[in-house]
Regions:
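Hydrophobic transmembrane alpha-helices
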Residues: 2-69, 112
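Short helix-perturbing small/polar motifs within transmembrane alpha-helices
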Residues: 9-11, 23-26, 92-132
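Alpha-helical membrane segments and adjacent membrane-interface helices in multi-pass membrane proteins
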Residues: 43-105
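Aromatic-anchored segments of alpha-helical transmembrane domains
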Residues: 30-34, 74-80, 123-129, 212-216, ...
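Alpha-helical transmembrane segments
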Residues: 18-31, 70-73, 203-214, 262
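Long, positively charged, glycine-interspersed low-complexity recognition regions
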Residues: 3-8, 238-307
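Central hydrophobic cores of alpha-helical transmembrane segments
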Residues: 67-76, 115-124, 232, 253-265
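Membrane-embedded alpha-helical hairpins and interfacial helices in multi-pass inner-membrane proteins
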Residues: 115-211, 216-227
C-alpha cells in the first residue's frame, strides 16, 4: 500500500493520475480549512504550511491542470467553510495560489529571489482582495476601526502604511513558506536551485536603485506617498542579494568599506531627517541597505575578477 501511495508522488502523465493527485491534495486542504474555521487561532500556523500542499501538487502534475486545481481547491475550501469564510479568504485561498505558483516556477527552475518576489506580490494582491471581500460580506472595515481607536483619523498616511505592512507581511510569509517548501522538496531528492553571482548582482542593483529613490524621497527631492512601498521592495532585494557578502570570509578592505559607508549613513540620516515629514523621512534609512548592496556588488565583481 505504501508503494502504491508513493506512486502518486511522481510526475503524472495520465489524466487519471493528475486528477487523482489533485483530488487528494484538495481533500487535504479542505480538512485543514475546516480545522481553521472551527479553531481560528490555528490559521497563522497552518498558513505557513498550507502552501507546501499546493506546491507539491503543482510540481508533480502536468501544468495544464494547475489552473483547474487552483480554482477547484479554492471552491471546495470555500464550500466547506461557508459558515466562517473569513480565514479561508485571508489564509487558505492565498496559500493555494501561492503554493501552486511556487510549484510551477520551481519546476521551471526560476531563481528563488524572483520566485519569492512574484509570489509575494500575488499574496499581497490576494490579501487586498480578501480584505475588501470581508468588508463587503461583514460590513465592517477593520482598518477604520483600528484608525479610530488610535485617533489617526486626521492622518493621510494610514492607508499607505497599511498597504506597506501588508506587503511586508506577504514578503515575510512567502520567505518562510519558501524555506519550508524547499526543506521538504529536498527530502524527495529534488535538486536545489542555486543562485549564481549574476542573479545576486541583479538583486543588489535593484536594491541600490530603489534605495536611491527612497533616499531622494526622504530628503524631499522627490515627493510621493509611495515611499514606504518602495522601501519595502528595496529591503527585500537587499536582503535576498547581500547574504553573499557574509556567506564566507571576504577581503578585509571589503569590511572596511562597509564600515565606512555605514558610519557615513548615520551622519547622513542625522543631517537630513525632517521632523515635519516623518513618514517620508524614513526613506533615509535606505542609506544602510544601499551601502550594503553597493559593497556586495563590489565584492562580487572583485571575486569574479580574481577568478
Amino acid at each position: 500500500r505504501f508503494n502504491r501511495n508513493m506512486q502518486l508522488l511522481k510526475r503524472q502523465e495520465t489524466p487519471t493520475g493528475n486528477i487523482a493527485l489533485l483530488g487528494i491534495f484538495s481533500a487535504i486542504l479542505a480538512v485543514f480549512s475546516l480545522i481553521i474555521a472551527f479553531v481560528p487561532f490555528t490559521s497563522i500556523a497552518f498558513g505557513l504550511f498550507l502552501p507546501l500542499i499546493s506546491a507539491v501538487a503543482a510540481y508533480y502534475v502536468q501544468k495544464k491542470y494547475i489552473p483547474l486545481y487552483m480554482v477547484g481547491a479554492s471552491l471546495i475550501c470555500i464550500g466547506v467553510t461557508f459558515f466562517n469564510i473569513g480565514d479561508t479568504l485571508f489564509f487558505v485561498i492565498p496559500s493555494i495560489f501561492s503554493g501552486s505558483l511556487f510549484g510551477f516556477m520551481r519546476a521551471k527552475k526560476i531563481l528563488p529571489q524572483f520566485n519569492i518576489f512574484i509570489i509575494s506580490l500575488v499574496q499581497f494582491i490576494l490579501h487586498v482582495i480578501a480584505y475588501y471581500l470581508l468588508i463587503a460580506i461583514t460590513g465592517i472595515d477593520m482598518l477604520n476601526v483600528v484608525v479610530s481607536l488610535l485617533n489617526l483619523n486626521s492622518s493621510k498616511d494610514y492607508m499607505i502604511l497599511f498597504i506597506s505592512a501588508l506587503l511586508s507581511l506577504s514578503f515575510g510569509e512567502t520567505g518562510l513558506n519558501y524555506l519550508i517548501i524547499e526543506g521538504v522538496l529536498e527530502k524527495f531528492s529534488i535538486e536545489t536551485i542555486k543562485e549564481g553571482p549574476i542573479a545576486r548582482m541583479v538583486s543588489t542593483s535593484i536594491a541600490f536603485i530603489l534605495g536611491l529613490v527612497s533616499i531622494l524621497m526622504g530628503i524631499g527631492i522627490i515627493s510621493s506617498q509611495a515611499m514606504p512601498i518602495i522601501f519595502v521592495i528595496m529591503l527585500y532585494f537587499s536582503i535576498s542579494g547581500t547574504d553573499y557578502l557574509f556567506s564566507k570570509i571576504r577581503p578585509v578592505w571589503i569590511y572596511v568599506l562597509l564600515g565606512f559607508l555605514m558610519i557615513a549613513s548615520l551622519f547622513f540620516v542625522a543631517i537630513f531627517y525632517q521632523n515635519e515629514n516623518p513618514i517620508n523621512s524614513l526613506g533615509l534609512l535606505a542609506c544602510f541597505p544601499v551601502s550594503l548592496s553597493l559593497v556586495t556588488f563590489v565584492s562580487i565583481l572583485e571575486n569574479k575578477m580574481a577568478q
